[in-house]
Amino acid sequence: MIASTAKPHVILAAVPIYGHVEKLRIIGCDLQKRGYAVTFLTGTVWREFVEHAGLPFFALKANADFDGRDFAKAFPMWDKLPPGPPRFGYLRHSLIDQMPAQHESVQAVLEDVAARGLKAVVIQDTAFFGVNPIQMGAPGITPAGTITVGITPLPLFSIDTAPFGSGLPPDSSPEGRARNIAANEKIKAVAQISQAHFTQTMKSLGVKTVPDDLLNSAVTTPDRFLQLCIESFEYPRSDAPSNLRYIGALAPGDENKSQHPLPDWWDLVIKHDKPLVVVSQGTLSNHNYKDLIIPTLEALKDLDIRVVTTLVRTDSLDGDLQDFQIPSNVLVAKFIPFEELFKHADLVVNNGGYGTVQTAFGHGVPMVLAGQTEDKTETNARAAWSGAAINLACQTATAEQVRDAVEKVLNDPKYKNRAMELKKEYEACDALQSIADNIDELAAAAAAEEEDENE
């Protein structure tokens, strides 16, 4: 008997934080165009955002259904802890707390799909662990395939890299590997409390053998781990798992392009009669403009360049900065789609949002980076390692630091040349096609296995 070639139902599962939901929304819209039926599982606050794109919505249960629009409210201890291991430990603990509700939510959608006689492939983002218990042996409905889409730097332990969060470059020399092994073991020792919490939680769900690290298991557990970057942006690992694939960056579909009109001064951007520098602090760490936006505007005010700053959460500088005098060479907007803005940029100054860095390099634009919250320490370290960026390696930059780095990048062609090399590598990838191909491969393999069992 020949295995069925019908397309599987695709369940998209995202933690309810914008950058996570937005990426899977792009994927979901593309899959619907390709003829897949989809269900989108995330927090209630994103129902309208998901349904506006024409995607069927299913709400997460219990504490997994939080309001990720306010990160500080969702994770109240985050801002009270210093960047680095304390914050990562707190975040790990919070993610583990949500796993039972995530697991229950995924099982509910799988039950709904199975009741219709359909097979499902589950796609989840890096921070969502709802399908992992099943992959680890917990009882319940097993999907035809599982895919995790990597939207952060890879959190893998490796003999060739220092532990995630250290910000150190890779080193595969004998001395470097000795450093890496020692540092990795130290981090595992520090994470013993959260690891014990992870182990207890997984066993409560019926998992018999629990992996020895939560973040590592995020990569190694699914059938496929599809990393949203090019291979040249991620550290090389001689011991990388076989399920890992690099698929390039996502291009936004029509449904995902911003509805914000372009500003009245957009002609000045298109005119491009002088170097254009873009500065932004992204969608999460954008509550203190003194971290990067203000130092950048101060640093560049006397240079013969044009600066565009996007504030994301407001239309103008507010709070204790509302009296700040905007320099004459600065144009301010709440939001401009980076896919449009970066076409005209010569340099991007940013705090290191993973998607923003991918978009900049995908357009061949070099960067100056400063940020140490969330995963930004690792993102910025990789960007500098790639050769297309300068990493200031701080949370709050000074005007002098920014000016020196901006002038260096604009005056030294090696940064632009390297960014253009990365652009070519991004252009050779088709992330959405790769995702569809992996869905089909997993569904076909599952169907063939089922046929063999029935013979």
UniProtKB/Swiss-Prot annotation:
One example GO MF annotation: hexosyltransferase activity
Known uses: Phaeomoniecin D was found to show anti-HIV activity, antibacterial activity against methicillin-resistant Staphylococcus aureus (MRSA), alpha-glucosidase inhibitory activity, as well as significant protein tyrosine phosphatase 1B (PTP1B) inhibitory activity and thus is a promising candidate for drug discovery projects.
Reactions listed under catalytic activity: exophillate + UDP-alpha-D-galactose = phaeomoniecin D + UDP + H(+)
Record-linked CDD domains: GT1_Gtf-like (cd03784)
Pathway: Secondary metabolite biosynthesis
EC number of the protein: 2.4.1.-
Top-level enzyme category: transferase
Record's keyword annotation contains Transferase: yes
Keyword set, alphabetical order: Glycosyltransferase, Transferase
Summary of the function given for this chain in its UniProt record: Catalyzes the second glycosylation step during phaeomoniecin D biosynthesis, the further O-galactosylation of exophillic acid (produced by the O-glycosyltransferase OGT1) to yield the 4-O-beta-D-galactoside phaeomoniecin D.
Family: Belongs to the UDP-glycosyltransferase family.
Protein name: UDP-glycosyltransferase 2
